[in-house]
Amino acid sequence: ICDKHGILLIFDEVITGWGRTGSKFGAHEFGVTPDIMTMAKATTNGVVPMGVVACNDYIYDAVMDSSPMGSVELFHGYTYSGIPVAVAAALAVQDIFEKEDIFNRAKNLAPYFQKGLFSLQDLESVDNIRGYGMMGGIDMKLNTKPGKAGYECFKACYEAGVNFKATGDCLIIAPQFICEEKHIDEIIDKLRT
């Protein structure tokens, strides 16, 4: 549809990239090729910050053809440019992804995680659950004020040894790809209590 109407398709794969959906990228999972794609976080496994913008030849050529001769490709600034340790970390992570077949591991574990995640739908404190692959969101029913229910659940789980992100009253669950079913069971059990 985007190609037919001359619309650029941009995928933000900062969270969904590098296996979180069960495929290397969410775009692959849905069989589309974006014109521009952003990546970060798992690019270096979060060891050091690194962000990436990838684009198709059409976009690249348009930028470079309108840039002064000798310009740096898709220049972003000095703060995040040319950090050798970030590149080394990214290359090491990519090597591990391949050698340990991490994407297939995530793809195989995802149905078990999703089943556990959606088993929480019957809890009185849960308003809505959504998930895909190795990620999920749980909207808590509002307590006395916005953010309180999410924070209380986050704090109780953290004290019980399960760490995740709470944004307002939404719990964001994204288990590590190296976890096992017993770890997912532990996460779900602690969320349930």
Where are these regions (language model features)?
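Conserved N-terminal phosphate-binding loop of PLP-dependent enzymes in the Aspartate aminotransferase
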Residues: I1-T193
